[in-house]
Amino acid sequence: MSAPALSELQSQLSIEFKDQKLLYEALVHRSYVNEHDEAASHNERLEFLGDAVLELAVTNYLYQNFPLSEGELTLLRSALVKKDNLAAVAKNLRLGDYILLSKGEEKSGGREKNYLLANTFEAVIGAIYLDQGYAASEKMILEFLLPTLDTIIAENLHIDAKSSLQEKAQASVGVTPTYKVIEESGPAHDRLFIMGAYINDELLATGQGSSKQQAEQAAARIALVTKQWP
């Protein structure tokens, strides 16, 4: 990766690395190392470290700012650090433009894969932690990840809607909801699923997402509103 590209990314992150090699390593996917002898290390160790730093920073922020029970705080934290949310932040930062991939991974759309983007975001956090300490990595997390919390709370994305719908349906009509694929489209690396939530043969709602599980949760959230089951 060229020095200008690294400089451009640092400008987007509002940070300047003392050790540029750490940022470079954070962007190296395992597949790239297999094809390039000069890339001695990939980013999985940094991802491991960044995951821990991320969890601490998010946990501390939620504890300090939300007087909620442990269970409620855990739900919010899980929604913040889940792969799809981290991937969305990575896309906003255009991290996919800078990831170093093998030719095969590149062809399969690796730059758009949510899990790969999320892992790279965590690796960058780990690199910042090693280069500049906890305060700098926490600052990045608060600046780029925490703004997603408003949407999570407003849209109840931290709530397990499927469990709530099941409880309400069993209590009201004695039936467990089921889910069916209504439509599946898009390339392998960027699938879109539309799932329907049903009670018996009645379609309550449809929801969409990048995985069946995500689409089912979306359908369940809409079904709860449709049935007026708060």
Positions of PLM-derived features:
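Double-stranded RNA-binding/processing signature
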Residues: 1-230
